[in-house]
């Protein structure tokens, strides 16, 4: 893959970045050592992203927005002219948005923090699995460890309160 990233603005509290990434994705699937042609594909994706981080109300706000475009280049699968709208597209377009706010505070002298994370995407086309949004891990939805959900469009919003609780073993902490 190839990546360009540039800081376009910076001051004491704010930083803005713009970036572009060109990625080739080579998917090879097998079942019992048998190559599965129908579910194996090569995709080329151009991602254009922007991000901003700034201090806000005593915390830190991070925002990311992006566009991903599937390209017909560098050996990628090419969509046929008569491809139905219900079939996955190698030449696709999807939009991504991420917001994250972290706020440190203290309660009765104990340090704690609040974080709120929003992540979402919207696709104009049906996507192959490698491009779909996937939720179902400790990092997206608590309690979703064994099961996952995926789709062309989706979002999740996760809020978290955390603090450190010291454990004491005898005379040591």
Q: Could you say what each language-model-derived stretch is?
A:
Residues 1:
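Phosphate/diphosphate-binding loops
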Residues 10-31, 47:
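Polar, glycine-rich mid-to-C-terminal structural blocks
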Residues 26-172:
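C-terminal outer-membrane beta-barrel translocator/porin domains of Gram-negative envelope proteins
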Residues 8-12, 56-59:
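Extracytoplasmic assembly/pore-lining segments of large envelope/extracellular complexes
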């Amino acid at each position: 893959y190839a990546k360009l990233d540039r800081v376009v603005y910076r001051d004491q509290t704010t930083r803005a970045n713009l970036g572009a990434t060109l990625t080739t994705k080579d998917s090879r699937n097998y079942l019992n050592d048998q190559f599965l042609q129908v579910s194996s594909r090569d995709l080329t994706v151009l991602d254009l992203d922007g991000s901003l981080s700034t201090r806000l109300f005593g915390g830190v706000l991070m925002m990311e927005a992006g566009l991903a475009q599937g390209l017909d280049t560098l050996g990628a699968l090419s969509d046929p002219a008569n491809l139905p709208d219900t079939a996955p597209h190698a030449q696709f377009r999807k939009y991504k948005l991420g917001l994250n706010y972290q706020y440190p505070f203290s309660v009765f002298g104990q340090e704690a923090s609040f974080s709120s994370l929003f992540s979402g995407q919207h696709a104009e086309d049906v996507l192959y699995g490698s491009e779909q949004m996937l939720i179902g891990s400790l990092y997206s939805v608590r309690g979703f460890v064994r099961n996952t959900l995926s789709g062309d469009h989706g979002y999740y919003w996760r809020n978290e309160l955390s603090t450190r609780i010291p454990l004491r073993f005898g005379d040591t902490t």
